[in-house]
Regions:
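Extracellular loop and loop/strand-boundary signature of outer-membrane beta-barrel proteins
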Residues: 129-131
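A solvent-exposed, acidic/Ser-Thr-rich amphipathic alpha-helical stretch
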Residues: 39-40, 58-112, 121, 133-136
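Short beta-strand edge/turn micro-motifs at domain boundaries
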Residues: 21-26, 138-166
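Positively charged n-region of N-terminal signal peptides that target proteins for export
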Residues: 1-4
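Short, low-complexity N-terminal intrinsically disordered segments enriched in polar/charged residues
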Residues: 20-64, 169-170
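Generic short beta-strand segments
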Residues: 120-127
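Bacterial N-terminal signal peptides
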Residues: 8-16
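Residue-level signal for tight coil/turn positions that link beta-strands
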Residues: 113-115, 150
Length: 170
């Protein structure tokens, strides 16, 4: 009788373990699909940033791309700690040069709950508004995104620097 009880308990536990494994596989599949959708959404957001930036539509860059409390850390400049400061930075830069992003490739995007981390490389040209030939550039960037209450992603932190080697030393 004891052997039969143990056998029944073993079969029940085995059945429960099998059903839990199936649920876990389904949960993993759903989670993976959610992560893939989030990665695609962030890559689409970056592509929209490129489109708006190239059109010099900086007001829409602010509303579409950046979180309300975003911080931009450009090289050799103080951190821009508000969307208004970021907008002013874009506008001042645009007064001097025409920046055109040819490509922006997100090399890696990692999702962690309501935060995401991405790094990539942009290439393009800078043309002085005062005249002169376009100068090619390549930069690497690192961004942190946060999921908003409406489930949209927005950039919370952005920093970038030149991807080219230093051509002169002080």
């Amino acid at each position: 009788m004891k052997k039969q009880i143990w056998l029944v308990l073993f079969v029940l536990l085995l059945g429960m373990a099998t059903s839990c494994q199936k649920q876990d596989v389904n949960a993993v599949g759903k989670a993976k699909a959610g992560v893939e959708a989030d990665v695609a959404a962030i890559k689409a957001l970056i592509a929209e940033w490129v489109r708006l930036y190239n059109a010099e539509d900086f007001e829409n860059v602010m509303s579409v791309f950046y979180a309300q409390n975003a911080i931009l850390m450009s090289p050799n400049a103080p951190a821009c700690r508000t969307k208004e400061a970021i907008l002013l930075s874009y506008q001042k830069e645009s007064e001097l040069d025409i920046q055109h992003v040819d490509t922006s490739v997100a090399e890696d995007v990692r999702i962690c709950g309501d935060s995401a981390f991405a790094w990539g490389i942009d290439t393009g040209t800078t043309t002085p508004r005062s005249g002169g030939d376009p100068v090619p550039y390549s930069v690497k960037w690192l961004m942190v995104f946060e999921r908003q209450a409406n489930s949209a992603w927005k950039c919370l932190y952005e920093m970038w620097n030149d991807n080219n080697p230093i051509t002169h030393l002080p």
